[in-house]
Amino acid sequence: MRTVMNYIRPYFRRISLQMMIKIGGTVIELFLPAMLSVIIDDYAKRPGGEGGVWLMGGAMVLFAILAWLGNCIANRMSTTVSREITRSLRRDLFRRITALSAAQQDAMTDASLISRLTSDTYNVHNMIDRMQRLGVRAPMLLIGGIIVSLVMEPVLTLVLIATLPLLAGTVIWSSKKGVPLFTWVQEGQDKMVRKVQENMAGARVIRALSRTKWEQNAFGEVNADLAARQRKADLTMARVSPLTSFILNASLAFVVLVGAHRVHMGYIGAGKIISFLSFVTIILNALLMVTRIFVMYSKGSASAKRIEAVLLTEDDLTSKAMEQEQESAHIVFEHVSFSYNKRYNNVTDLDFSIGHGQTLGIIGPTGSGKSTLLSLLMRQYDADEGEIRISGKPLQSLSKEELHSRLGVVFQYDFLMADSIRENIRFGRDIEEAAMLDAVSCAQASFIHEKDGGLDFELNVKGRNLSGGQQQRVLICRALAGDPRILLLDDCSSALDFRTDRELRRALRERHGLATTVIVAQRVSAVMAADLILVMDKGRIIGKGTHPQLMENCPMYRELCQLQLGGDAL
């Protein structure tokens, strides 16, 4: 909760003002039963006391209106403060999530991060809001009601106070049980979010393979697990309210019995007992409010801890200041090995270098480590062994901003936002119109000019109103528009026809010849003109050289060429 308190601290003045208004309204509420007692015992029984009844009754109405207005104003202020605190918390949480390394995202899972950004922040919002509304009001009504009751009728008040230890024990028990239970529920919600996310992403494949029923059953299992968790948590917490109500009603009945006896014996008047019972009702309602506060605190505290776990996560990809070495090569991998799970290597002993302005082609079967190599170059992960250098600088010595400013990237499975083509290409960067048009031309994306509005044509979610090849060309435009010094293309032309692919590669050589280009591809034709080609299999480089060299000394490359190009490969 310490981190969440840092977000609340700037609003202390507004919270204090709201609490002062709440205190004023609560104090007024505490006067009302005493005024009722005066009306019944003093004015109603006195001859000619009608004027006093009307006067005191009018004062009660005025006080009730003032208390209502004060509570309305305070509640509005608490809602505004809670909304602003949650907005700041959600903003910083989103920024921290986007700054997490790939390894940290893998550890926390996307589903859990989405859940923390949505339902957990909502729970924290409710906790802050309820604590402002009831955190002062409930204790004041409880303590104030007990004090006034003690002054008014000590015997009956002591009867009521005798039940408080039972209530306190119930509240403490619910608080201790609640936090771990609701943390467990949120973990179940993470699983459900992950299942929904998988089904939304793979909806077309699921329908195409007629696996809809199977996925519905799988979702049903996850949903049933979440329902079971919620049921256990809700049933545990649901015991609190009935138990509290039983204790309160039992104490109220006992107070009424004792009070009736004291009225019958003439120790107190009817007005005083009615007023006292009003205070008892106030005290009991305040106790119920306290119970609700603890239930809400249990939910909010569990969510706050999950949010703090993300906000307090330190960068695991730190930059280290090092002396720059003079090196002619632009990109160097020196005996690099890496493992995702730290048990077996996904890539082993990667060793190569490529000069400024040259093209590196990477080819190999699925799962050979091609995309992992790019992830290491982009420093989504740090290598376990070996060293990666860019322009003579170890990758760890470059800040994220410095590294990413050099890169232009098109991933194998990239995304387009539901926005205009212009904004998808700009992607928040300050890019001039001329640079965007040049990128459109180079990426062979002339179809954009044929769309209604050109660059201002609106895309659907994930660009689904474009064909696969058109989507890839818009993504290539995005990478080229920033004029990168290193261009990483991860199988980004797989949906292009051979003619468009050939024109794209020719335009890249002519217009971006100064950039070092790394091409990951399944097609031999996409890499055969590269200055250096890496042939990868099972995480290792099994062939390295130019196209003619590999045709002579790499059987796998030669076989790929013969399968894809036929006689043209020889």
PLM features per residue range, with description:
Residues R9, I15-I73, L150-V155, G266-A270:
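Transmembrane helix-loop-helix hairpins at lipid-water interfaces of multipass membrane proteins
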Residues R9-R13, S78, A99-A103, S119-Q132, ...:
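An intracellular "coupling" helix at the cytosolic face of ABC transporter transmembrane type-1 domains
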Residues M20, G24, I28-L32, G70, ...:
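Hydrophobic alpha-helical transmembrane segments of ABC transporter permease domains
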Residues M20-I21, G25-D41, F63-D110, I114, ...:
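Juxtamembrane helix-loop junctions of ABC transporter transmembrane domains
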Residues P47-G49, G58, V148-A162, L235-K305, ...:
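Helix-loop-helix
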Residues L93, I97, I206, I307, ...:
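Helix-loop junctions and hydrophobic alpha-helical segments within the transmembrane domains
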Residues A201, V280-K342, D382-E385, R389, ...:
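ABC transporter TMD-NBD coupling linker
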Residues Q326-L570:
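ABC-type nucleotide-binding domain
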